[in-house]
Amino acid sequence: SPTNNFATFNPLVNVLNNPTLSEGNLKTTYAASNLWNGSFGTMSVSSGKYYWELLGSGSGYFAGLFLDDGTVNYAASPYTYAQVGMVMIYGEGGSNMSRIDNNDVSGKLFGGTLAGDVIGVAVDMDNGTLAAYNNNVLKFTMDMTASGHWGAPMIPAHMQHSYSGSSSTYNFGQDSSFAGNKTAQGNQDGNDIGDFYYTPPSGFLALCTKNLPSVDVIPSEHFNTVLYTGNNVSGRGITNVGFRPDFTWI
């Protein structure tokens, strides 16, 4: 059985014109021209420091984090900056690299990104910062707490407005060749885990199960039996379950 699992994109949560996922759910290919496409990760984070990479495309994309608590409308365009819970880097091929900060990206340009550039995302959930790298050069560090778009848990997200057939490929530590599009570099995090194109910043780890905090699974917090006697009254509430159930069998 697997001893470690890395984050990927979740094929069950694709929205906004449903991009096609391939290469182990790390490559997102966009089917519709001039329409937004969105992909969202399989692992959320509430604490710790994590790093992942994106093989940059030549067209506009957003890469970063969404709140994973139902706050963000996944089906809305990322241009709706007023959405609380969205922290994103904006990259536009050959034009600019910006950040969403206080619902605005205007005036925050950090140089162009080109197809083939490796974009690094370093997320510090303990201190509320997101750092963006272009080919291992730090472009900016964003204070997510000041932006009003930060919270926990948060989930990796990618959105793109592009031409039909364009794609982006991610690496959460599985494959620094980006599915054969680069020469693998074999860099690891501080726990000697992962295969990154560039060495993660000090203290930042691959987003994988080995690097996530251990979780105590307590059966009574996930399953319970409640006995009651029917009284032929509609609208009756059955209480004392101990948690909010997702599935009830009567």
Residue ranges and their predicted role:
Residues 1-250:
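PRY/SPRY (B30.2) beta-sandwich protein-interaction domains
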